Amino acid sequence: MFDVFRLSCLDYLIWLRSGKDAALGLNCNQATVSRNAKSVAEFLDLDPCKLEGEWSLSGDLSLLNAERKVHQLYRWAYGKSMRIDAVYGVGSDYLNELRQPWVCGPSNFLNVSYPLALLRESILDAWLGCYPDVPVDDDEFVVINLTRYPSVFLVDQQHPLLQRKVELKLDDLQDFPVLSLPDGAFPKICLLY
């Protein structure tokens, strides 16, 4: 129904949440992304809406999702532009060295629901997450452990937690946030499924 490029314009716009980033990922200009995304949405009688930095579509998505499945099978079968992304703080270690056919996202998801929705809708092909947020194996997703070693908490020798006399628990770490994000870097509202 749609050629790979036209549907990719819509999907990259939804995935990357920016016409500029979608254009960079597809090696074209923003006007081309916008025009193609709009034509797909109009053809399927869908209403695109950007709310708090994230794109969503309203209307009957059944035909679009079927078309996405076909395009995803094509990407998998022919190794074409397979899309991968990650939760904030995880992706750079794994994704920096990936080469074609992988297309890497910005690894700026702070929630689980949005990337899982992108996986369900065949917009993403793979996503790197962290426990306990990743789903258990089910009919829809396969979880592949990339490391068998636990994460550790590293601090400076002068950190206040080292002054405690009792064994540390995970709750003790909550008073010391580790992410430093610029204002407005991420949407305030996430998609729920």
Q: What does each model-identified segment do?
A:
Residues Y193:
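Conserved small/polar residues in nucleotide/adenosyl-binding loops
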Residues M1-L110:
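N-terminal hydrophobic or amphipathic helices and topogenic motifs
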Residues Y78-Y88, E167-K188:
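Short loop->beta-strand "edge-of-pocket" segments that line small-molecule binding or catalytic clefts
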Residues I84-V90, L110, G129-P132, D156-Q158, ...:
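Structural motif
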Residues L146, P150-S151, V155-V178:
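Flexible hinge/capping segments at coil-to-helix
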Residues V112-S113, E167:
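Structural motif corresponding to alpha-helix initiation and N-cap regions
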Residues S113-V155:
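Short beta-strand-centered segments that line the small-molecule binding cleft or hinge
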